Amino acid sequence: MKQLEKITPRDVDFSQWYTDTVINAKLASYGPVKGTIIFRPYGYAIWELIQKYLDAKFKELEVQNVYFPLLIPQSLFQKEKDHIEGFSPEIATVTRVGDTPLPEPLFIRPTSEVLMANFFKNEVKSYRDLPLIFNQWTNVMRWEKTTRPFLRTSEFLWQEGHTVHSERKEASDLTLKILDTYTEFAQNALLLPVIPGKKTEKEKFAGADSTYTIESLMHDGQALQCGTSHYFADNFSKPYEIKFQNKEGKLEHAYSTSWGVSTRLIGAIIMTHSDDNGLVLPSMVSPVQVRLIQIKETDEVIKVTEDIKEALKNKYRVDIDKTDKSFGFKISEAEIKGIPLRIEIGPRDLENNQVTISRRDTREKIQVNVNEVTNIVDQMIKEYDANLYAKALKNREERTSRANSIEEYKNILAQNQGFVLVPFCGEIECEDDVKKQTSTNSRCIPFDQDNKTEKCFNCNKDTTLKVYFARAY
């Protein structure tokens, strides 16, 4: 089949390839305001599948869904100093209604910690009121300078969880349970071989005591943060006065967390799995898992097509391309949309009671007896997903290096983008210096540490920490 000319090859211009894939797969279009996108039905369907999977996992952790307002009074936001400093350059502000100035500026939420904290303050009186474990599926706005569909947009969709607890350990444990949930989801549903770990002091969330992350490596060797979980200790409960009466009858500040993933995950899927022919989607988040295409609409072809759909529909998202387009166009469209399996049904194959099944990832075709379609589809979907994960893991492993000095680190960066594991002191000033020299930053402190004392790769101080650094989106 001819290569789709609309898509720039990855190796020619990765950035343009990404944009071409988003547009041609009809995932999104550009909005009228810079940095905004229109989620087209196919792109939004992927987000709905992400929501469905994660929401079920959250409910297993007794998370309750809520919805909080879009607007935050400036005075409320400014109570947590680190938080306001972290977000102030990106905040969009409402100052008037019609021609009437507002008595106080209102911020369009960049995140909802302060709104949740204000609610918790009024809601929590006793340890018996705790824990409160909330989540909302919503939009937020952060006025980004450099934007790209899904990866970095001024308005994006996400889930943000916010919790408050009577015990420090309970809050800290939940932070890690959520990280485990994100890790399992990324690896099993999105087929992203992520590295879970802790953020450095420089990279942790504004106002957090500690931030945990899952980091993934894209096809071009740049890292992408795919989800974060933050433990605040009492950093928010003190300025927002979230107090409760403990079991001893004394007033105590509560312990809080927040955590989130966003539509940036769609960008991660594209940049990890897709190819020069368009989108390649993991089966769990593919709006259509199996597409049936008729070569010629004879009575027998129509009947067999409907029979196959009936046999598959209880287990898979399956459709029939009934558009009035040419057979070649239908094949190209199924490819560019990343549909995992395509079944072609035509009169010639049916003479031998066969149909043709094609895999999107390898583009291999096999002829299958009509009676075996269900079993073969089961097998091929498993093989398809396993291959996507294996390819992504191979890319990460081939692009992961170790360095012991800043010179060695720079040499690696010059030759090969990817993760570089280095001994690092963890100090903010040292990381600032690394960023100034290399335009890279730390991605995470992996949980798997050897605890050997070595010299920091940049400042030469003794350290036991090993940290991943990389260029990142």
From Swiss-Prot:
Aminoacyl-tRNA synthetase as UniProt keyword: yes
UniProt-listed InterPro entries: aa-tRNA-synt_IIb, aa-tRNA-synth_II, aa-tRNA-synth_II/BPL/LPL, Anticodon-bd, Anticodon-bd_dom_sf, Pro-tRNA-ligase_IIa, Pro-tRNA-ligase_IIa_arc-type, Pro-tRNA_ligase_II_C
Keyword Manganese among record annotations: no
SUPFAM superfamilies: C-terminal domain of ProRS, Class II aaRS ABD-related, Class II aaRS and biotin synthetases
Molecular function (Gene Ontology), one example: proline-tRNA ligase activity
Domain notes: Consists of three domains: the N-terminal catalytic domain, the anticodon-binding domain and the C-terminal extension.
Identification of the protein by name: Proline--tRNA ligase
Organism: Mesoplasma florum (strain ATCC 33453 / NBRC 100688 / NCTC 11704 / L1)
Source taxonomy: Bacteria, Bacillati, Mycoplasmatota, Mollicutes, Entomoplasmatales
